[in-house]
Each structure stands twice: as structure tokens, then as C-alpha cells.
Amino acid sequence: MVESKQYKVALVLYTQGLDYDDRIRKEILSIQGLFNNVHFKIFAFTPKDNREEEGVTSYGVPYKQLYLKSREKYPSGSHTLAKSWDLYKTIKKETKDFDAIWCADPETFLCVLLLHGKPLLWDLHELPESFMHNSLKRALFKIAVKNTDVMVHANKPRLKYLVSSGLISDESKQFVLRNYPQFDEIDNEYDETYESFVNWLGDSECVYLQGINAEMRADVESIGAVLAVPDLKAVIIGNVSDTRRAIIEKTFGKDQLNKRCFFTGQIKQLKTPQYIRKCKLSLVFYKNVKPNNWYCEPNRLFQNLINGNPVVVGENPPMKEIIDRYGVGVCAKTDGSNVEEITKAILSLKENYECVQAKVEECKNNWLWESQNSIIHNIVIKWLYN
């Protein structure tokens, strides 16, 4: 292949919303910054919005949202194979004039398995748990892996888990691209929600809680630990389901929540640093209920660190390794299930706050997305130029 050639890349994506899919945005923009001859178009399907739409993302990349007839025909959660086959046929037709394919997440498995003849990259943000405990699915997954030119994983523990599980054997085409934030990921326009938060917070110390929208993310335990520390408040970023909100209100009472917890609802990724910079620390927990949780190191962990906030995390291997190596927070002696241990970790961090925050300031540039440019370059070379 010649570097002057212009490459049209089709990116196949299952997403809750393109403007909220931060990792994809960073990957595309980084590749286009390093290779001005690589051009993307996103082909997206979403869990709720089954309609066709074309446009341009907020970061300037053309997209097409796909309509799948099978999703209209069959109820949600049923006829998965028929829907997957429908997606494959649609993608095959849509991408016939493209030079290369980028598939994101396990949901695009059938496309990875059946699309041939073009350079193929499979970006596994999540572990393919549905393929791990069924012999037929495992066999099909291994075939799909062989069909790829490059695979990308969110961190080393996830890749090691797939290797130890016997799902991956050829490590020469495996790359790790961690979901670090970008330094300029901040919106300088402040909306009414933020102004209301600032007025509500006053001079109080605040804990940053993002994405605690499920029991496995220790929502009740995290809020309970904050409320156990006098004069500490919390800001909860992101949507909380009616079911979880009802449980939280029943556990702590509406009056106490109104005084010490501020719920922002869904906000755009670029606005999150506004709230982080008003907080003293963050809690990040994923209970050990499945591998995707246990091997997680979410973007909000790194967002807090590059913005100067120490963190309290659970014993999950990727997050614990960061705390043990750099001393930028406290690792609680729990996966998030024990409120008392989380509270102890918060108090420990507060007692040693100046020392820990100094380490955060010293190390925070280690977790910038741009630090991985050489990895991204090698991924593209292996994918398109081999």
C-alpha cells in the first residue's frame, strides 16, 4: 500500500449516542491527525432509536444511523440471531465502496466473522462475556479473531484475561489503547445546571460521583459513605434510573439527599471537568460481579486525575495497580460492597490529602490521551499498511 492513497474507513458502532461516545471520537480524531489520508464514516445502530438518519457529528465526521427492519419486527431482547444477520447484510451493502472496516465492541461480532477482503480492525471496549461459556460461541469467536488484522483492548488486564481464557492466541496483532482523557476536554460555557450546582455547594467540600447508575457501580454504598462523613457533599453526574433513584431516596431520605447530594442528570462529556474542578476527590467502584466490571478502569478515573483530583477506588486490578504504583489516591479494602471500608478510605485520603494531591499533580500528565499517539500510529500501520 502507498501512503499517498486515500483510505475510506467504515466504522461500525453500537452506541447510546455518538456525541456521548467519547472513546470513538478520540480514536478517530487522533488517527486523522496522524494520517491525513484516512477518512472515516460512522455506521451506527442504537438500542432504542431504530430509524435511518445521516449527518455529521459534532466533531466533524459523517455518520449514518441505521434502520434495521428486524428490530421493528421482533421485540427487544428476542431473535438476536435474526437481528445480527440483518445488521451484517446492511453493513455489507453500506461498506462495499470502503477500503477498510473498523468494528467496535462485541455487538459487531457477526460483521467481524463474515466480512472478508478488506483490512479489518476489531476494537473491544468491553470483554465479550456472552462468548466465554458456550463452546459453539467460543469457536465462532476464535474464527472471528483470526479474521481480524488488528484487535484493540481497553487495558492489559482485559487482554490477559482473554489470553488466559483461551479466546486469543495470536498476540502479535493485539494492542492496548487505554481510555485516557484529552487535556482540552473542557467546555468553557457554563449552563444553568452548573450555576445551580455552584450555588448549592457553597463553601462545602464535594465528592465527584459519575455514572453510579446501577447497583454494580456501588451507587448506594458510595452515597452512604459520603453521608457518613460530616460536612461532605456529593455531585452525581449522569442519569440515574427511576428505580435506582427510588432506592436511594428510600435509603437516605429526600431531605438529606437534597441537602448533601446534587443530581445533574445527563451532561456532555466535555462539561464534566467543570464539576471535577469544584470537587475534592472522587469515588470509583465496580463490584466484582462479572469480568467487565472487575477489569474496568473508566475514563472518569483518569478525568479526575488529570484535573488534579485524588481518587478512592476499589480492589479492581487495573485501578489498584495505578494507586499502588503512583500513590494518587486510596484503594479501599472492598470492591464497593462495604460502606464502612469506603468511608475509612475517604477519611484516610482526607488525613493525607496534601501529600496525595501533590502526587496527582506530579503524575497527571501520565494519563493524557495524546501520550498514546505512538500506539495509535502502530495500530494504523499494522491495520492498513501491512
Question: Predicted segment positions?
Answer:
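A short, active-site helix/loop in glycosyltransferases that binds the activated sugar's phosphate group
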Residues: 111-112, 146-174, 178-186, 247, ...
